[in-house]
Amino acid sequence: MKDAEKREVIASSSLQRKRNRGRRLRKRRRRNEKRVLMVPSSLPNDVLEEIFLRFPVKALIRLKSLSKQWRSTIESRSFEERHLTIAKKAFVDHPKVMLVGEEDPIRGTGIRPDTDIGFRLFCLESASLLSFTRLNFPQGFFNWIYISESCDGLFCIHSPKSHSVYVVNPATRWLRLLPPAGFQILIHKFNPTEREWNVVMKSIFHLAFVKATDYKLVWLYNCDKYIVDASSPNVGVTKCEIFDFRKNAWRYLACTPSHQIFYYQKPASANGSVYWFTEPYNERIEVVAFDIQTETFRLLPKINPAIAGSDPHHIDMCTLDNSLCMSKREKDTMIQDIWRLKPSEDTWEKIFSIDLVSCPSSRTEKRDQFDWSKKDRVEPATPVAVCKNKKILLSHRYSRGLVKYDPLTKSIDFFSGHPTAYRKVIYFQSLISHL
């Protein structure tokens, strides 16, 4: 045998020994892991449950496959609720941000159902990517994707152009297809033109996902000739549909606001209520509030004067620390002031002023492909969260990214982004599923 052939045989033999050694080590590791995982089964159930409550969702999902008893415990609604309470408390010390958007968007003129949505979870403080989940929604959205705020780790993803209404928990990968709302059925009977979709029907694009005793979807929209329903008890300027998860059905509310809502603004929920801006009437904007528990509407008794007389395109509404916040970007100075509503709903306090025009942002613009310091942009940025170092995480309706604004240095830094990030929200994982 030649020397070259001998060396080849020796190398091959050595490689095979390494592979066999690797297999033995992996088998031994799996046996050890199984022993470790099976040890807690000898503990009392209440002690075991207290231990499990501190585990992250991913670990609990793995544990379910090891024991029928563990699966029964982890999937019980009482355990899910207790785990949710702990997750909310942990969020205060370790806040996270979720970016939700379409994956592999379909390009071209042909209308095809886009079916894959990606969920990217980031650490708020470090901007590091913690997890990525990609889920398939078989019915598709026809490139008109709208995503609600997160409610206990759940999202509602819907499309007015199709009958798609999904509720999803990206942490557990659970999703549920809901029946279409009444207006979705009515609209498709009329087959609106592209112009009618873009102009007339904008108020139907956003819904609220909330929880009182039970979870519910609240869909408030302006009336239109295409969505006249004889079964609706209301013939006013707005209609509201509520989805009941127990009955798996939508129902109309009899009493709805007598003000049309401003179509562009997403609803915000805080302190047990959902809020919408109205269209200007007599050069004044009102705020409609919906009590989640009693399912009744009211107008806020007091609105900040700087907001009430504004063009609705120049103001914004959001939730920070479960408080309703509103902001306006002044046309002269381009400085954006942010006010917070106190729980009594009779006092507004200014909490931040943002001066993006003064920010050097060339690096940020290059990464985000969006000019955050543009001088003639009157639409305000939307605060998403406040970091421990007092920096403010900002999004914008025209940007697919997030930036951190430092009020002390008046500077911004790129946080993260994605070309199709439709929704950017604070988020914590939960086990809540099977609504």
UniProtKB/Swiss-Prot annotation:
Basic residues composition bias: residue spans: 16-29
SMART domains referenced in this protein's UniProt entry, alphabetically: FBOX
Source organism, top-level taxon: Eukaryota
Alphabetical keyword list: Kelch repeat, Repeat
CDD domains named among the record's database cross-references: F-box_AtFBW1-like
Listed Gene3D superfamilies: 1.20.1280.50, Kelch-type beta propeller
Cystines in this chain: none
Stretches assigned to the F-box domain: 37-82
Protein name: Putative F-box/kelch-repeat protein At1g13200
Species this chain originates from: Arabidopsis thaliana (Mouse-ear cress)
